[in-house]
A protein has these predicted regions:
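Bacterial N-terminal signal peptides
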Residues: 1-6
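Extracellular, repeat-based ectodomains that mediate carbohydrate processing or recognition
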Residues: 60-64, 75-84, 112-631
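Low-complexity, intrinsically disordered segments enriched in Ser/Thr together with acidic residues
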Residues: 68-107
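Extracellular Ig-like/FN3 beta-sandwich strand-entry sites
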Residues: 97-99, 499, 557, 960-964
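Short acidic/polar inter-strand loop motif in beta-rich domains
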Residues: 109-111, 568-572, 971-978
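Extended, charged catalytic domains and RNA/DNA-binding interfaces, predominantly
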Residues: 538, 589-989
Length: 989
């Protein structure tokens, strides 16, 4: 039960209370109950963690406590011990005073409380600790459509009003489904290429406690990404957005657009950027003269830069490049003070790790770049705001050293993408001195996400962010490297109100909970009143993906309005599915989840003045020399400089992978945001291409598919970096999980058909339909973890639709053959033991499969799919896959294996005895290099050098027989390279 759309909390004197019941329960327990208000009335009840038959009727609820819902082992916590978690309701109550009494009757006992007992950040208990009560901000739903409203931005007007911009995505009604299943094989695949309704930018006004109607800023049918808004000195709101100006062209071009909206009426539309590189992520602020500034991320000459432009009347001046380093720059943030200063902050990979820099313009003249946080640790995602005193506050994420470097089942000297984040806050005085609040925000923010809301601890107690090399060395059989038990607080949003009170919102998965569309992340708010930070305040209806940034705006001292989108994923009961024969994928015809906008209001009173601050250490810059892996950089240069000469033209080695997961996957709770996967690929991984391969692009939901497709185009930088359109299609053994890849945008994910039984020696109808679908859209697929419960017994293959296999993945093991290095075994198989799935058995059946390696979940920097391609265009990369011109490796190892004019992956006939010429260039010494023919070792050498080159001839071929030959190289570091087989038919002379 929700508040009426647009119903202003202030107009009703509303208070919201989170009532959690069954704290500490060890078995599922009934907590049916009723709420009564003396001196007021109940306005609404929201469910907390409902599932099954849990329900609400008026002021009465019927529910139990339940075992926590988690998916697989990729959740950032464990269910060891008691896994029964509290359930509850969120009550919104209208009262005339804080003396109102609330009485609650439950099946486990009765209790009561006075509203005045509850203050923000100070929970109370009842029934000997089995009941938890805390006051939370009232959340008002401000959109309620069947479409998706997302990416809100907000700005205060001159008269206390608030303007909100956002994007609305319009569904194709035929595809607004959640994992819809197929009853029979499709005969026509055209519906899986049908268009969406696209995006449209809207604006709304909030004034005098009332939300106005949506105001269209653009037409519908766009391909748009993120908004920003600012109000100029004349009181006119300016709305900014990024839009693919070439949509639906094959080559995207996102540009920054703006429209002034005087009095809420659309004015002239302006294109601010104009460059072949994509321009995205606008942020805006208004300077002391009333001019609006906008900053954004734009791709120039193959690298992402930070740019800015300034309003001049009803136009904007030319774009200026703010960042100067020749590395990728990310996440611009902007703020202006009342003395003519405008500051833009961002994070940069200039020092071979992420650091934060800022640059300030005074009266329009840019000063030098200044480091904000530049240690050897990961520092990213700044959010900035000025105090009235001219002090600039910066909040940002801090992670461990070695972010995005080697992490997987066999090696953990680095830190994976989402292995821990702490939020830091520091201030910069006008004279450059660095200060900090007198108490640590880490003593208020959530710690390591726990399944129990009261057990997570605090950030300050979970800050062992740096790598643990012993992690992989001490892993248990059948399990991967352990998730590091750190705080995971992300995407800080900071603002300062006119009294000087600092407001900080952060994203957390605490308490951990899984829904049918994935892990639940929510927003927590803390505030610094000049003396100390409040305890965390939960924001209702903030449940959504990890990368979900609310808009914070204050129009009165001590008060805050938070506008955010929620896809309602905390409501497990909305998406509960019927039992399905489709392996891990439940099925439901309609999609009950969609994004709406909500507004939360909170009043904590004015801050103490002046704010108490303490001196902080000056910023130290570690620099690239202290961070860079010179061996890695040299190996990358050698690979990129290398050319393979063939009769069909020169080929380059194009490094990448197409099996990375993110928040979009239903089991992506340990993987991090999807944009962080691109950050990893572009920077820490230094890849040339990537496929962000989430499960069905998010449970087969149209909206997350649309976002995934959009980002695949946003990060496309022709000639420099090539994202491919990719997803994982998971069907349990014996049919198998497969990663799908296309060179074209717009192909939707294919639903499932019923799975075949393991003891049935038949072709799988679902897999056969997948092959037909791939051929219809010129795509390919690759099975992964083939000798596990996610694998296949190789009952199916199509040489055109499935030309390669993921022979190795960093998150788990090698599936080449039994007893090969890093292969799984009956005693140690991460993801169950299914020996019929070894790749050697597929090759023995005559299947022609090239070899590639990719990461899967969590793992970084140790799985590479190296394509031998004419160039880096999407079409050339797909062509290399289809020709099996590919090799897999766990490090940046160069491999060139030929037979006469033929290269790895080729199938051909010869009258000569088959011969191989092998050239390997490693990152360390090769301890062994072997040649394998028809699943037998036929040659082995132990070179003890990093450079290997030799020729080998098969002196005993069988005339008329086709044999496959491939090379495996093993380094003394344990790293491996697999050159794809060649299939050679010996015809004899």
């Amino acid at each position: 039960v929700l508040l009426a759309v647009g119903l202003p909390a202030a107009a009703q004197n509303l208070t919201s209370v989170r009532i959690l019941l069954g704290v500490g329960d060890t078995t599922p327990t009934r907590w049916d109950g009723t709420l009564q208000v003396a001196g007021g009335s109940m306005v609404s009840l929201d469910p907390w963690r409902f599932e099954g038959s849990d329900g609400i009727s008026g002021a009465t609820w019927h529910f139990s406590t339940h075992p926590v819902r988690l998916f697989s082992g990729t959740s950032p916590t464990s269910t060891a011990g008691n896994n029964i978690v509290a359930n509850g309701v969120i009550a919104t109550i209208s009262t005339a005073s804080s003396d109102a009494e609330i009485k609650i009757t439950t099946a486990q006992g009765d209790f009561g409380f006075r509203l005045g007992e509850l203050t923000y950040g100070k929970p109370v208990s009842r029934l000997e600790g089995k009941v938890h009560l805390d006051r939370i901000p009232v959340s008002t739903q401000i959109t309620n459509t069947k479409e998706e409203e997302d990416f809100p931005a907000a700005a205060a007007g001159k008269n206390g009003e608030v303007w909100v911009a956002y994007i609305q995505f319009h569904h194709n009604p035929e595809h607004n489904a959640l994992r819809a299943a197929l009853d029979s094989p499709p005969k026509d695949f055209s519906k899986w290429k049908s268009p969406t309704g696209g995006d449209q930018v809207f604006m709304r006004k909030y004034a005098n406690g009332t939300w106005g109607d949506p105001i269209p800023v653009t037409e519908s049918g766009l391909d748009a990404f993120k908004t920003s808004i600012a109000v100029d000195g004349q009181g006119r709101p300016w709305v900014f957005w990024s839009q693919n100006a070439r949509f639906p062209s094959r080559i995207p071009n996102f540009e920054i657009f703006a429209r002034v909206m005087p009095g809420g009426q659309p004015g002239k539309r302006i294109q601010i950027s104009n460059d072949p590189g994509n321009d995205v992520a606008p942020v805006a602020a208004t300077d002391s003269k009333g001019n609006v500034w906008v900053a954004w991320q734009g791709w120039r000459n193959g690298k992402a830069a930070i740019l800015a432009a300034t309003q001049s009347g009803s136009e904007f001046g030319p774009a200026q490049i703010v960042s100067k380093a020749p590395a990728n720059q990310w996440n611009p943030a902007i703020a202006a003070d009342q003395k003519g200063r405008v500051t833009v902050a961002w994070d940069t990979y200039r020092n071979e790790n992420y650091d934060i820099y800022m640059r300030t313009a005074v009266d329009g003249n840019w000063g030098p770049e200044t480091p904000v946080a530049a240690t050897a640790r990961y520092e990213a995602y700044p959010s900035i705001a000025y105090e009235n005193t001219g002090r600039l506050w910066v909040a940002y994420e801090e992670g461990g050293k070695g972010w995005g470097k080697d992490f997987g089942a066999y090696n953990t000297p680095g830190v994976a993408v989402y292995q821990g984040r702490a939020i830091r806050v520091r201030g910069f005085e006008p004279d450059g001195r660095v200060v900090q609040t007198v108490t640590d925000p880490g003593a208020s923010l959530p710690g390591f996400p726990s399944i129990h809301f009261d057990k997570g601890g605090l950030q300050k107690d979970f800050e062992k962010l740096d790598p643990d090399p012993e992690n992989a060395k001490t892993r248990k059989p059948d399990t991967g490297a352990r998730n590091m038990q750190n705080a995971r607080n992300n995407f800080p949003r900071l603002t300062v109100d006119s009294s000087g009170r600092i407001w900080l919102a952060v994203r957390s998965a605490h308490p951990v909970f899984w829904s049918p569309i994935g892990t639940v992340w929510t927003e927590f708010l803390i505030s610094y009143d000049g003396k100390g930070w409040t305890n965390p305040i939960f924001l209702n209806h903030s449940d959504n993906l990890l990368d979900n940034k609310p808009a914070l705006v204050s129009t009165q001292p001590g008060q805050l309005l938070v506008v955010n989108s929620s896809d309602k994923r905390r409501r497990y009961d909305l998406g509960e599915a019927i039992n399905s024969p489709l392996g891990i994928m439940p099925t439901r015809k309609e999609d009950p989840y969609e994004n709406d906008l909500y507004a939360s209001t909170i009043d904590l009173g004015v801050a103490s003045q002046p704010l108490a601050v303490a001196d902080a250490p000056p910023v130290q810059v570690a620099g690239a020399e202290a961070v860079a892996d010179k061996t890695d950089l040299a190996a990358l240069k050698k690979i990129r400089d290398y050319t393979i000469n063939t009769s069909a033209g020169d080929l380059k080695i194009v490094r990448g992978e197409f099996h990375r997961h993110s928040e979009i996957s239903m089991d992506g709770g340990g993987d991090g945001s999807i944009i962080d996967q691109y950050r990893y690929a572009l920077d820490a991984g230094s890849l040339d291409w990537v496929g962000c391969c989430d499960h069905d692009n998010g449970a087969g939901r149209e909206y997350t598919w649309w976002l995934s497709q959009k980002l695949t185009d946003i990060f496309y930088s022709p000639g420099t970096f090539t994202p491919m359109f990719s997803y994982e299609r998971s069907v349990n053994y014996p049919e198998g999980h497969r990663n799908v890849i296309f060179a074209q945008r717009g192909v939707r994910t294919l639903p499932r058909q019923p799975i075949t039984e393991e003891n049935q020696n038949v072709h799988a109808p679902d897999t056969q339909s997948l092959y037909a679908y791939l051929k219809a859209f010129n795509g390919i697929a690759a099975a992964h973890t083939s000798a596990t419960g996610m694998g296949t017994d190789w009952r199916d293959n199509d040489p055109l639709a499935e030309p390669v296999v993921e022979i190795y993945q960093g998150d788990r093991q090698n599936y080449e053959m039994p007893d090969a290095p890093r292969s799984n075994s009956e005693k140690d198989s991460i993801g169950l033991w299914r020996p019929k799935g070894f790749v050697s058995l597929a090759l023995a059946k005559g299947y022609k499969l090239g070899f590639q390696a990719s990461s899967d979940h969590i793992s970084t920097h140790m799985s590479y799919c190296n394509l031998l391609a004419k160039d880096t265009s999407r079409e050339s990369l797909l062509d290399a896959f289809q020709k099996r011109h590919v090799y897999g490796a766990t490090d940046n190892i160069l491999a060139d294996v030929r037979s006469g004019p033929h290269i790895m992956g080729d199938a051909f006939a010869t009258a000569e005895q088959p011969n191989l010429h092998v050239k390997l260039s490693g990152t360390s010494k090769f301890s062994k290099v072997v040649v394998i023919k028809d699943n037998n070792y036929v040659y082995s050498t132990e070179p003890g050098t990093s450079q290997v080159e030799f020729s080998w001839r098969d002196n005993s071929p069988t005339k008329g027989k086709t044999s496959y030959y491939y090379v495996r190289g093993e380094q003394d570091t344990g790293d491996i390279v697999w050159a794809s087989p060649m299939w050679i038919t010996y015809t004899g002379k």
